[in-house]
C-alpha cells in the first residue's frame, strides 16, 4: 500500500460532514477498514460533528477521494456538493471507472491513479461548468447530521422558544391532534428538562398545547340552567346595551335580536351580563367567542355566567317536600 494513504493525518471532507464545531476531536485507525471503491485498507477517521449528531467515519480511501474530488464520507463532489455521476454528466467528463471484477485489479488501478493525481482527468466545457455552478448547494445543510432514528418533537419549541435553534436534534413542529390526548410518557414529544410525567415542563407543555388546540369557543358549563355570558373589562364608550347587542349579532350571524333576552350593565365594574332566550342561543354565541377578544381598540374578556346560589328558603322547601 502506498504511503499516501497510510500516513494521512487529516481526512478529505466537505464542510457539511465536518460539522460546525471548530474544536472537533477525531479518532484515527490506520488500516482499519477496506475502501468501498478500491478494496484497499486505509486509515479510518471517526468523529462527532456536533452535539446530538450521529458519529461519522470515512468510507473510502484518500486516493479514491482525490481522483474523483469527493468527500471521503458522503462521496459528494467537494466543490459543488453533487453526486459524481451528475457532475461528470454535466461537465462532459469521461473518466475510466476502472475494473469492477477483481479486487487485485481494483487495487492496481488505484495505485496507478495515485501516481497520476497531478494529471487532469478530462476536459469540461464552459456550459457544463456554468450548469454545475447553478446546481451547487450554496448553504451547508447541517440537518443531515441529525439522528435519523429521532422523530420526537421538541417540547421547548412547543412552549414557544427553543434555545438550541437549528442545532436542535428534535423536530420543530407542533403535534397533531392524535398526539395530544393525555400526553403520556410514551407520546412522541421529547421533554429535555425533566423525565417525569408530573414535571413542571410537561405540565406547561400540556397546558399550552391543550389550550391552543382545544375545541373552539367557550366550553359550556354542566349546569343547563345557565343562559348568560359575562363580559368584563368593557371600554366606557361601548358600555351600552345597543353596542353589546350588535357585537354579538355580528359575531354570530345566525342569532336574531330577539334571541338576546336582556343585557344587564354594571357600570361601576365595566362589565355586563348578556342573557339569552334559550340555552341553545347561548351556546351558539359561546362557540363564536374566545376568552379574550377585542371590542373597538380594547381587549375584553368573556366567560359563561355562574349559576344562581340556592336560597335558604328554597332549600327548606325542598327538604320539606322530600320528607312529605
UniProtKB/Swiss-Prot annotation:
Domain RRM: residue ranges: 227-317
Coiled coil stretches, renumbered: none
Signal peptide: none
Protein origin, superkingdom: Eukaryota
SUPFAM superfamilies, per the entry: CCCH zinc finger, RNA-binding domain, RBD
Any GO BP annotation: RNA splicing
Ranges where the record places region Disordered: 173-206
Keyword Hydrolase on entry: no
GO MF, any single term: zinc ion binding
SMART domains in the record: RRM (SM00360), ZnF_C3H1 (SM00356)
Protein's cellular compartments: Nucleus
UniProt keyword Disulfide bond, yes or no: no
Comp. bias (Low complexity): 185-201
GO cellular component terms, A-Z: Prp19 complex; U2-type catalytic step 1 spliceosome; U2-type catalytic step 2 spliceosome
Pfam families cross-referenced by the UniProt entry: RRM_1, STL11_N, Torus
Role according to the record: Involved in pre-mRNA splicing. Facilitates the cooperative formation of U2/U6 helix II in association with stem II in the spliceosome. Binds to RNA.
Record-stated family: Belongs to the SLT11 family.
Subunit structure: Associated with the spliceosome.
Name this protein carries in UniProt: Pre-mRNA-splicing factor SLT11
Protein source organism: Mycosarcoma maydis (Corn smut fungus)
Gene for this chain: SLT11
Amino acid at each position: 500500500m502506498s504511503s499516501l494513504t497510510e500516513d494521512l493525518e487529516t481526512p478529505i471532507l466537505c464542510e457539511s460532514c465536518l460539522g460546525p464545531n471548530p474544536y472537533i476531536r477525531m479518532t484515527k485507525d490506520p488500516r482499519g477498514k477496506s475502501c468501498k471503491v478500491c478494496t484497499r485498507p486505509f486509515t479510518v477517521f471517526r468523529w462527532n460533528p456536533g452535539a446530538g449528531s450521529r458519529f461519522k467515519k470515512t468510507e473510502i480511501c484518500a486516493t479514491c477521494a482525490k481522483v474523483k474530488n469527493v468527500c471521503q464520507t458522503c462521496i459528494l463532489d467537494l466543490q459543488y456538493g453533487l453526486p459524481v455521476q451528475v457532475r461528470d454528466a454535466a461537465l462532459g467528463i469521461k473518466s475510466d471507472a476502472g475494473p469492477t471484477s477483481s479486487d487485485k485489479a481494483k487495487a492496481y488501478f488505484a495505485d496507478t491513479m495515485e501516481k497520476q493525481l497531478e494529471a487532469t482527468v478530462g476536459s469540461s466545457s464552459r456550459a457544463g461548468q456554468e450548469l454545475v455552478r447553478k446546481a451547487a448547494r450554496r448553504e451547508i445543510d447541517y440537518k443531515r447530521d441529525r439522528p435519523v432514528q429521532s422523530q420526537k418533537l421538541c417540547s421547548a419549541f412547543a412552549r414557544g422558544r427553543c434555545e438550541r435553534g437549528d442545532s436542535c436534534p428534535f423536530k420543530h413542529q407542533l403535534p397533531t391532534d392524535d398526539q395530544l390526548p393525555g400526553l403520556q410518557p410514551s407520546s412522541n414529544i421529547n421533554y429535555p428538562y425533566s423525565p417525569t410525567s408530573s414535571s413542571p415542563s410537561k405540565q406547561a407543555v400540556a397546558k399550552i398545547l391543550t389550550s391552543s388546540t382545544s375545541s373552539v369557543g367557550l366550553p359550556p358549563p354542566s349546569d343547563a340552567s345557565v343562559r348568560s355570558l359575562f363580559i368584563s373589562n368593557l371600554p366606557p364608550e361601548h358600555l351600552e346595551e345597543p353596542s353589546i347587542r350588535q357585537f354579538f349579532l355580528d359575531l354570530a350571524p345566525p342569532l336574531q335580536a330577539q334571541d338576546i333576552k336582556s343585557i344587564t350593565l354594571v357600570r361601576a365594574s365595566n362589565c355586563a351580563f348578556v342573557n339569552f332566550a334559550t340555552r341553545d342561543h347561548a351556546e351558539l354565541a359561546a362557540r363564536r367567542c374566545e376568552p379574550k377578544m377585542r371590542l373597538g381598540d380594547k381587549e375584553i374578556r368573556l366567560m359563561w355566567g355562574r349559576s344562581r346560589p340556592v336560597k335558604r328558603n328554597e332549600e327548606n322547601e325542598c327538604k320539606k317536600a322530600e320528607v312529605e
